[in-house]
Amino acid sequence: MDKLTIQASPPLAGDVIISGAKNAALPILMAGVLAETDFVVSNVPNLRDVSTSCKLLRCLGAEVTELGDGQIRISTTNLNEFCAPYDLVKTMRASILILGPLLARYGTADVSLPGGCAIGARPVNLHLHGLEMMGAKIEVKEGYIKARVDGRLKGAHIFMDMVSVGATENLLMAAALADGETVIENAAREPEVIDLANCLIAMGAKITGVGSATLRIQGVERLQGCEYRVMPDRIETGSFLVAAAVTRGRIRCLKADPASLESVIAKLEDAGAKITTGEDWIELDMEGKRPKAVNIKTAPYPGFPTDMQAQFCVLNALAQGTATITETIFENRFMHVPELIRMGATMELEGNTCIIQGIESLSGAQVMATDLRASASLVIAGLVADGKTIVDRIYHLDRGYEHIEQKFQGLGAHVERVQ
């Protein structure tokens, strides 16, 4: 199994090109099932979860062609299977996003209950309740969600009990082909949801309220393929910016989307970073200074993203002062904390809050990645730890970061992948 070995590195310096957003690419690939003609997606990152999505589409009978340079073409002409099997779904929670498109276009879908990162329950009941309101008959048995509808799904007024990105995306895709108007209230407003909505509109869907908490979808009878470019990955961008801040460096993130990162940029500025932005780039200059501690509370967009929480744990571990980080989205999302403590960090957990006392330096250690963003935080910690850090189980990292060691090497970091 691959590992990353990391030696204490100089301040990061230079330019890094940001990949397409995993969390936008996955639902957009699933949306290919809705299109009657060829659908071409570009700026798709080369990641394990993307490969799993392509395998899933092929398993359903879709023709998936990787055209190179981050382009994927999907043709559903021969799609004739309607079951997403356990062996694929168990490795990636986003497989649940095939449910809405299959049901809306073909009237039938069997999807194994999902797996993915081990961060909390993340129940699928919001997805199922919304589809039932649209007329689907759903039963969960033998580990599978079995959904059926006679004819088309029907438009419905759906109020989401809690903000859920995945459920918003699933219902948005299903509603695009439903009969009549669907209103989704308390919808997720994340940039990746906006990206999916814009993609569906490019296919011919009628959606208003994009980017707000109330989405209105006027169902159409058919959707056509289109060419669509996936947005830049705001979490990858944020991870590199934090790494630069922690190493007291200066970097530019190119092909980025500053507008999607306002809450993260604000916290980095609070920590003492000088940040400049253009239309598609962000520059961070720490000017050689030690970061200042910043309090964080995660929240649905436009609040501070839960996917950046672990990286800010590392920043605060090395900052001047004491800070608290409160996680409100997922339970069980501080699994990186015991690993950072092994590296010398002064941290204490109280319920869903981590209290962090900043110290001058960390020590290299052998640590274990437990989920995707936790593993990124351990890599960042390794860049500034004395001695050698070995990060085990980096298959988690490969689920969400494209060419991570090469990108860090390009900024001057001492990071290597070993077998």
Curated annotation (Swiss-Prot):
Top-level lineage group: Bacteria
Coiled coil: none
Pathway noted in the entry: Cell wall biogenesis; peptidoglycan biosynthesis
UniProt-annotated binding residues for phosphoenolpyruvate: K22, N23
Annotated residues for binding of UDP-N-acetyl-alpha-D-glucosamine: R93, D307, I329
Keyword flag Cell wall biogenesis/degradation: yes
Keywords attached to this entry: Cell cycle, Cell division, Cell shape, Cell wall biogenesis/degradation, Cytoplasm, Peptidoglycan synthesis, Pyruvate, Transferase
Catalyzed chemical reaction(s): phosphoenolpyruvate + UDP-N-acetyl-alpha-D-glucosamine = UDP-N-acetyl-3-O-(1-carboxyvinyl)-alpha-D-glucosamine + phosphate
Cellular-component GO terms for this entry: cytoplasm
KW Cytoplasm (keyword) present: yes
GO molecular function ontology, one term from the record: UDP-N-acetylglucosamine 1-carboxyvinyltransferase activity
Family membership noted in the UniProt record: Belongs to the EPSP synthase family. MurA subfamily.
PANTHER family: UDP-N-ACETYLGLUCOSAMINE 1-CARBOXYVINYLTRANSFERASE
Name of the protein in its database record: UDP-N-acetylglucosamine 1-carboxyvinyltransferase
Record organism: Shewanella sp. (strain W3-18-1)
